[in-house]
């Protein structure tokens, strides 16, 4: 009496491994661009939330609150939110892999007054360092002082 063996042959397993390798090779570039898009989104959200925090703290404290840029090693940027009395409210560490451009270029800080309005209304363009033309977000400060995030370059 003959029994049948069940299982896979070595050739079948090698074909499956080769197909999985090809599919993985096709998925890696799209995953990289997805990670870059998410990196820019995260940076713009962090800036947006820090600007919103500075505005709400200025209203709550009935005094000026300033968001100032900080330059870290390797041209990485972050910022610090401070009250008029010098108290540090929030510190944002270095954001790796993104470039933040402030327009106008000579703006290094934004101060919110007790009314919630900013003394200046700069725009922040956030780019990914590897492909700056594809993944760009713009964070603006409206006349009311509220920050606003837009897809694409600042115009």
What is each residue range found by the language model?
Residues 6-18:
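N-terminal signal-anchor/signal peptide hydrophobic helix marking the start
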Residues 2, 14, 26-56, 60, ...:
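N-terminal helix-rich module
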């Amino acid at each position: 009496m003959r029994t049948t063996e069940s299982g896979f042959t070595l050739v079948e397993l090698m074909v499956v491994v080769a197909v999985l390798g090809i599919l993985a090779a096709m998925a890696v570039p799209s995953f990289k661009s997805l990670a870059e898009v998410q990196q820019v989104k995260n940076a713009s959200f962090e800036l947006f939330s820090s600007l919103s925090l500075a505005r709400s703290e200025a209203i709550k404290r009935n005094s000026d609150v300033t968001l100032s840029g900080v330059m870290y090693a390797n041209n990485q940027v972050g910022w610090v939110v401070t009250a008029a009395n010098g108290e540090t409210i929030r510190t944002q560490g270095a954001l790796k892999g993104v470039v933040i451009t402030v327009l106008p270029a000579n703006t290094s800080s934004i101060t919110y007054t007790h009314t919630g309005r900013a003394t200046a209304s700069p725009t922040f363009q956030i780019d990914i360092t590897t492909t700056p033309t594809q993944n760009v977000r713009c964070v603006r400060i409206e006349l009311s002082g509220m920050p606003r995030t837009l897809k694409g370059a600042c115009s």
